[in-house]
Amino acid sequence: MGQKINPIGLRVGIIRDWEAKWYAEKDFASLLHEDLKIRKFIDNELKEASVSHVEIERAANRINIAIHTGKPGMVIGKGGSEIEKLRNKLNALTDKKVHINVIEIKKVDLDARLVAENIARQLENRASFRRVQKQAITRAMKLGAKGIKTQVSGRLGGADIARAEQYSEGTVPLHTLRADIDYAHAEADTTYGKLGVKVWIYRGEVLPTKNTSGGGK
């Protein structure tokens, strides 16, 4: 059912492409674990750089990494110093030659992961869960989103009984496979425990294109 499954996984190969673009028969497990290690390392190193997602391509003994970020200047650093440090660390981590490409996200309020992390960060700073959700919805709709839904769950406002509250505006057609829906979840560590944040953003319809190499955009 469209409302239960992860909207991104449901659309991979139809209107969304894979974030890992490689194939291996014998070494699949070890390369998959290496991918997970790379993603975790980048998330830890670039915590404050608004990283949305990371794409990994492999060719022989070389790894091409595309980092989609809302703050490219922070990733690159002055004169490329920060990206050079990151490349050297990834070279040592993987024992392979790593090439990094930084891609700027121009509209950060239309990226579900960045919106979810922003809400979580504000909740950690004791902001009102109602206000931060409504503000996120207003900003996304102003930038041209067709619809957005947010949900915060846990001990809201320090209540003894955990609950979930969600707000939405516009339409979010989860069953429509050609609907470009971005989804993400984040966690906020508060004094009362963890709060879960979920965000769905509908950015319009995308017509699927035929791809003989195995789907995707």
Swiss-Prot record:
Q: Name one Pfam family in it.
A: Ribosomal_S3_C
What is a biological process (GO) this protein takes part in? translation
Ranges for domain KH type-2 come to: 38-106
Which SMART domains does the protein's record reference? KH
The alphabetized UniProt keywords are: Ribonucleoprotein, Ribosomal protein, RNA-binding, rRNA-binding
Cystine links in this protein are none
Does the keyword Cell cycle belong to this entry? no
**Matching PROSITE patterns:** KH_TYPE_2, RIBOSOMAL_S3
Any one GO molecular function term: rRNA binding
Q: Which domain of life is it from?
A: Bacteria
Q: What does this protein do?
A: Binds the lower part of the 30S subunit head. Binds mRNA in the 70S ribosome, positioning it for translation.
What PANTHER family does the database record attribute to this sequence? 30S/40S RIBOSOMAL PROTEIN S3, SMALL RIBOSOMAL SUBUNIT PROTEIN US3C
Q: What is this protein called?
A: Small ribosomal subunit protein uS3
Gene name per UniProt: rpsC
